[in-house]
Amino acid sequence: MDASTLKYGTFVSQLSPCGENMEYDPRMMALEEDIIGKPEQQMGDSIIPATPPNWKDILKNATSLLEDTRDLRVFIYWTAARLAREGLQGLLEGLQHILYFSSESWDELWPVPDDGDVQERLSAFALLSPMAGSFDADMTVVQLLLDQKLCFSHTVGSYSLRDIREAQETGNEEARKLIRAAYLDSPEAELQAVQTCIENILQCLRDIRECYDNHGMGTPDLRMITDIVKEMQLFYKSQPVEQLSAPAPVSAAEAPVEAAAVAPAATVGAVAAVPVALPAATPGVLNGRQDAIRTMKALCQWFEENEP
């Protein structure tokens, strides 16, 4: 992998490539608390609702720590925060850092193997991919993945994997038709960008497992995150091959930063990220003639199927 494509692709110093162990640094301790959020509390007759993690603060603390250390635990917190703030593109870039330093600095990456024991590293992966059936599993990242938008129509609306699952599990045919209409009304370039990002994430997960396999000290259980991303991929593969139209691609400079995706650039270690921004859907807003044509076609199809 070309380290120049990574935000933190350099070593901290020549004498100490991965810096110092920040396990007891106040910033690390704050990260470990912030990632949990605050559970629901009861004070007398009052119920104080649970508070989700403050991803802005988590990203800030993790970024600060990465100036001084190369620590798998910090990279995982940083990856989760990037997913929360930037979508699948953030997840991919975080995984690329994890892969790069696991491959290039196996003996120096914190926490360092303890006489061949990498259990501390394997345990750190549980935040990204909790073990199925574990009663105390942290499902934070899983919930973030389920909320990622997979189709985004300016008129019909945006739908996530959670929405798609719910429509399938409840047998809600109306919801399924709306999701299909939203897919057909989504710009083809952006759909392709998300699919490419998904493919690259899956490749990165495979490469991380292979890296740990090759060292023979234990392999992280990445089945849950892999299965969810594969489910996203399956959604796209099950959709119609033809789009209603092919709108002009949106440049990164013209579109929002959130939920950016990547263009393909496969290497053995991972893939270089070339961001392609995804649109933030604004229901009811048409941006030009092509939007209007696609919307009319999608609506006509919906009426034909539902009100012949």
Listing of model-derived features with the role each one plays in the protein:
Residues 1-114, 123, 131, 140, ...:
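N-terminal domain-start signal
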Residues 111-293:
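Mid-to-C-terminal functional-domain signal that highlights helix-capping/loop sites
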